[in-house]
Amino acid sequence: SYEFSDCNENEYQTYVTDHSPQCILNDPLRPDTVSTPVSGNELLEAGEDCDCGAPANPCCDAATCKLRPGAQCAEGLCCDQCRFMKEGTICRMARGDDMDDYCNGISAGCPRNPFHA
């Protein structure tokens, strides 16, 4: 198994914090996933609302990969108990010269602050 050394991990964190490389920080788009949709592989693929991986996720029906009735989301920094967190809730704290990122109230993802350094 390959693991980062403490030194490499610190250098990587510094790079990500200082340069905000979008190719690393952005979630892949659903059409970018190349595999056939498979329930439980923990990848959100075309046609899936959620992919819980384990039947224990209360927001996702593991048999259909669809959100359970009343659920808005199954995972994400802005998803809490199957609901989108309120707009303005901090989902990623500022690092260095960067600014906090906030939930938008309409998605489970944590959008990057457009004014980040």
From Swiss-Prot:
InterPro entries: Disintegrin_CS, Disintegrin_dom, Disintegrin_dom_sf, Peptidase_M12B
Pfam families xrefs: Disintegrin
Gene3D superfamilies assigned to the protein according to its UniProt record, in alphabetical order: Disintegrin domain (4.10.70.10)
Domain Disintegrin: 36-117
Subunit details: Monomer.
Tissue expression per record: Expressed by the venom gland.
GO biological process: proteolysis
Lineage of producing organism: Eukaryota, Metazoa, Chordata, Craniata, Vertebrata
Principal subcellular localisation of the protein: secreted
Name of the protein: Zinc metalloproteinase/disintegrin
Cofactor note as given: Binds 1 zinc ion per subunit.
Assigned keywords, A-Z: Cell adhesion impairing toxin, Disulfide bond, Hemostasis impairing toxin, Hydrolase, Metal-binding, Metalloprotease, Platelet aggregation inhibiting toxin, Protease, Secreted, Toxin, Zinc, Zymogen
